[in-house]
Regions:
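Conserved N-terminal helical subregion
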Residues: 1-69
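Active-site catalytic microenvironments for nucleophilic, acid-base chemistry
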Residues: 10-13, 72, 186-190
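Acidic-histidine catalytic/liganding microenvironments
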Residues: 14-15, 152, 248
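C-terminal helical "tail/cap" subdomain of flavin- and related membrane-associated enzymes
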Residues: 185-265
Length: 265
């Protein structure tokens, strides 16, 4: 993807990041030795994750997601939009003034939809952009996963390896951004005080984020289950509820802040 290419480019320029070739014994050495002060593990399928971080709360949404990026005419593109369709939630997530990321979650994985059908549905519900073209579609099964324990000794799980939620309005990425901010602040604080970067940072990180991430992800799960239930009955409940809430200024102000910043308890 373009984002991956940009990250790779920045990493190559960064003198503090060293690229290494992973050998078979690499993960065993990390687990056994104390060569590094802190290790951040964001890969879900490596030996560290499988051997140490395997206790998770999981849920199969029994849904599939289609993702793509659309190119469109230039516009002020600074608002994420979530539409609850009869097939499932459709999210328009700003990427730039000429590109928007699309995430379409089909509620029933048994109802196979072709790329052509998904494209037609996106065009049908799009009221915001003059679309010029679609990039390649990606399709994946949706599953919820959140770790019970965030760290082991000096190893911290991070990103999708830490929590993977339903892509309602792109909130999974927002959760990771908030985690990055909290972890970065904790590291800066230790450095400013001249204290070592050790596992105490990971303990503090878990203490500051675990309850918020769980509450937040549970809220996303509730919204998903509600609209899945509501979808079976012709969206009668959601139409009335959203119609009422749409007129409530206080609710709209809070929900916008919640979407941008998440929980702040």
């Amino acid at each position: 993807s373009e984002l991956y290419a940009l990250v790779q480019k920045d990493i190559k320029k960064n003198k503090f990041i060293k690229k290494i070739k992973i050998k078979k014994s690499f993960y065993d050495e990390i687990i056994k030795n104390n060569k590094f002060d802190l290790i951040i593990n964001s890969e879900t399928q490596n030996k560290i994750s499988k051997k140490i971080f395997f206790k998770r709360i999981t849920k199969d949404y029994k849904s599939v997601a289609f993702t793509t990026i659309v190119k469109h005419q230039k516009c002020i593109n600074n608002k994420a939009v979530q539409i609850f369709t009869s097939c499932g939630p459709l999210a328009f997530l700003p990427y730039s003034n000429t590109e928007t990321s699309i995430v379409f979650s089909v509620l029933d994985e048994k109802k196979n939809k072709s790329e052509k059908e998904i494209k037609e549905l996106i065009i049908k519900y799009n009221k915001y952009y003059k679309i010029n073209s679609f990039k390649n579609f990606e399709k994946y099964n949706l599953k919820f996963s959140i770790l019970r324990k965030y760290y082991h000794k000096n190893i911290l799980c991070f990103g999708d390896n830490l929590h993977n939620i339903h892509p309602l309005a792109g909130q999974g990425f927002n959760m990771t951004l908030r985690d990055i901010k909290i972890l970065s602040d904790l590291i800066d604080e230790k450095i400013d005080l001249g204290l070592p970067l050790d596992s105490s940072i990971l303990k503090e990180f878990e203490s500051k984020t675990k309850h918020l991430n769980y509450i937040f992800s549970s809220g996303i799960n509730f919204i998903h289950e509600f609209f899945k239930f509501d979808n079976k009955y012709g969206n009668n409940y959601s139409k009335e509820i959203l119609k009422y809430l749409g007129k409530n200024n206080l609710f709209n102000k809070y929900i916008s802040k919640f979407a941008d910043q998440g929980l702040a308890l």
